[in-house]
Design a protein with these regions (language model features):
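Charged DNA-binding/catalytic regions of mobile-element recombinases
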Residues: 1-311
């Protein structure tokens, strides 16, 4: 029908083509053309006219890292009536896509003879409340000014990054600084907390164990010595490198460690406050924790009222 509409006013050898002649050549009834021309736009046509702009804004606000599934979830959370297949189709038409993770680079070679903390996790990286299980790891990022070493501490319940540090070395102090940030953000005393890591020397040090003991936490280390023994921390490291270090907004190398540190601050805030995490139901970590504490506050108030009513 678009062909007829586009060509009906053309003139060939002094004669205007018109609808009737084109329909005769195409073996289409003129009434079919007029019916299609006068028909109201379909719901799909109308939505396809509006949704691309909305999707692009959501993708851009998500640091241009969301793929089909996460952008679809973000669109639904934003109140858009859209399906996953439609999201994929519109993303293709817009020429946008999610970031792709690269193969992990091994940074720690465990010493099987070294004394290490026991494995208290057994590859179960989940918990029923915040501050029951933290996981931590060190990774590195090359810059023009030298190698930057990055330590993250993640709460297994909500996937919140509770502490982090970017430094020019991978000494124990780098890990201790991340613990200090976590202690400042989560509380000075957290009895029953386990802090899981790989078998790097920083995490086997006496000072590391003593610092955790100060907040009531106990260190633990996986026993096998492969990425699955610290899978959650490895996942966050992978997200960090795909979304920030090699992300769409920074295609080239990082100039200085300070530049990377400032950018990491922004990424951690977005990771905690806005990024959707599939493992926790496609909500941001902050939203999950807020709901947890609100529910427990309500349960506590109900229990107190029940107790008072029985007196």
């Amino acid at each position: 029908m678009d062909f007829i509409q586009f060509n009906k006013d053309d003139v060939v050898e002094g004669l205007k083509l018109g609808v009737w002649l084109i329909c005769k050549v195409l073996q289409v009834a003129p009434s079919t053309y007029y019916a299609a021309r006068d028909r109201a736009p379909s719901a799909r046509t109308l939505s396809d006219a509006v949704l691309p702009g909305e999707l692009y804004s959501l993708w851009e606000n998500a640091r241009k890292v969301y793929g089909v599934r996460k952008l679809w979830k973000a669109a639904r959370r934003a109140g858009l009536s859209i399906g996953r297949d439609q999201t994929a189709r519109l993303m293709r038409s817009l020429g946008i896509e999610g970031v792709k993770r690269t193969k992990r680079v091994k940074t720690t070679t465990p010493d099987p003879t070294a004394v290490r903390h026991p494995d208290l996790v057994k590859r179960v990286f989940s918990s029923t409340a915040p501050n029951q299980l933290w996981v931590t790891d060190l990774t590195f990022v090359p810059t023009w000014a030298g190698v930057a070493y990055v330590c993250f501490i993640i709460d297994a319940y909500s996937r919140t990054i509770v502490g982090w540090r970017v430094a020019s070395n991978m000494k124990t102090e780098t890990v201790l600084d991340a613990i200090e940030m976590a202690r400042w953000s989560r509380g000075k005393k957290l009895p029953g907390l386990r802090c899981h890591s790989d078998a790097g020397s920083q995490f086997r040090s006496i000072r590391y164990g003593e610092r955790l003991a100060e907040i009531g936490a106990v260190p633990c280390i996986g026993t096998v010595g492969d990425p699955f023994d610290n899978a959650l921390a490895e996942t966050v490291n992978g997200d960090y490198k795909a979304e920030l270090v090699r992300g769409p907004d920074h295609p080239g190398p990082w100039k200085t460690i300070e530049e990377l540190e400032l950018a990491t601050l922004g990424w951690v805030h977005w990771h905690n406050q806005e990024r959707l995490h599939g493992f926790i139901g496609d909500v941001p970590p902050a939203e999950l924790e807020e709901a947890f504490y609100a529910e427990n506050l309500q349960a506590t108030a109900l229990a107190e009222n029940t107790t008072l009513g029985s007196l």
